[in-house]
Amino acid sequence: MKKTLLTICLMIIAIAAKAQVPNFGTTAGDQKLYGYSAMKYKAKAKTWETYSTLQYGVTDYMNVGADLYYDGSDSYIGYTFRTGKKFSPYFSAGAQFTPSFNLGENHKFAYMTEALYMNGNITRDGRMFWVTNTWLEQANHELSSAKQWTYLGYTCPLGNKGNSITPMAGIIHDWKFESDVDLSFGAYYSHKNINVYAWTNDILTDHPRFVLAVEFKFSNK
């Protein structure tokens, strides 16, 4: 187990952006360790962001964990509480709450992130599916950001070993009505308990973002 944890930490350090790749409604599961780490590049602005999170399943329906985020100038740590459940093959729902603190200002509270995740199958075999994520960010006692990310995806099996690639495309809607609808698309490759993402969003803006990320889940049982 110690060797596995060390491997995970090294992966995070090596790969470690606050990026909205699709999040699904379910949690990691009881006694399972979940990790996600990404790098995001904002074109033309030539800035890099990094984001990493580790979460542990305390029950089948609840994760607790922490994340680290660097926006190009400041570093933040967040403490995550996530819950979720699969109600049927066609509907899963979950929520996440993360207060974040500025590490450069003596752990001063910076902002609160709240999210609602929903997803479900469209076809009976589960290959075609939908995902929707609602992200709210509150700073200085006011709602600073409210975005809706909605995706369609299709899983394409690769061979007979359980590997697959899943292209997805979606739109980004601003619930504050301060920006135009935008596009997001990408794909992830799945091998056993590991997903590797190549993603992009803000396509129609002056500064599109490009993301590379890895996601993994291991059981402690």
Predicted regions and their residues:
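Positively charged n-region of N-terminal signal peptides that target proteins for export
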Residues: 1-4
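Sec-dependent N-terminal signal peptides
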Residues: 6-8
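Hydrophobic h-region of N-terminal signal peptides that target proteins for export
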Residues: 10-18
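Outer-membrane beta-barrel biogenesis signature
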Residues: 17-41, 221
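Strand-connecting loop/turn motifs
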Residues: 30-34, 59-61, 86-90, 123-127, ...
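Outer-membrane pore/translocation modules
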Residues: 33-50, 55-56, 60-151, 167-171, ...
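Outer-membrane beta-barrel "beta-signal"
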Residues: 82, 185, 206-221
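Glycine/small-residue-rich hydrophobic helix-like segments
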Residues: 159-195
